[in-house]
Amino acid sequence: MNFKYIVAVSILIASAYARSEENDIQSLSQRDVLEEESLREIRGIGASILSAGKSALKGLAKGLAEHFANGKRTAEDHEVMKRLEAAIQSLSQRDVLEEESLREIRGIGASILSAGKSALKGLAKGLAEHFANGKRTAEEHEVMKRLEAVMRDLDSLDYPEEASEMETRSFNQEEIANLYTKKEKRILGPILGLVSNALGGLLG
């Protein structure tokens, strides 16, 4: 009987965590949409300015190179050309740095998601071990089936790019974001239902 209360408390904690995750996902999804729109506008403006600046510098460098090709360069002319070439190279490297920053941000997000999945898998594994050591009622068997389904869904999130590569290849970024939000809600839905049913059975 005491163990039932321990399991019930564990399930209550999991339920609260799942509800919190669902609320956080909804809030973050809305915030992400707004932030993504703002970032797209900022990147678009910045990219236009940067592209115009690079084009102007390249045009200037090309013009000077053609001019110097028809005559001898002074030491000062040579220094000017070196600085122009360095400026163009620096602007090209900035594009690479922006891509590296995006990879770092994605890595941090993946780590947070992995930690949440590990916590839920640990709870599911503990309940599975408990039920494996004794006879299961029909209700407990149903609980375990749902737990196993949830764990399979969590495992499928470990390789989202492989699982949905063909499905999302032609989607734009906003459609991809909506797809992953729906998938997370589809996984959290069974968790909430599972917790409610298990709690009702244990305390009933």
UniProtKB/Swiss-Prot annotation:
Function (record text): Has antimicrobial activity, but no hemolytic activity. Preference on killing Gram-negative non-enteric bacteria.
Domain of life: Eukaryota
Cellular compartment(s): Secreted
Name under which the protein is recorded: Bombinin-like peptides 1
Tissues expressing the protein: Expressed by the skin glands.
Gene Ontology biological-process annotations: defense response to bacterium
Signal peptide region: 1-16
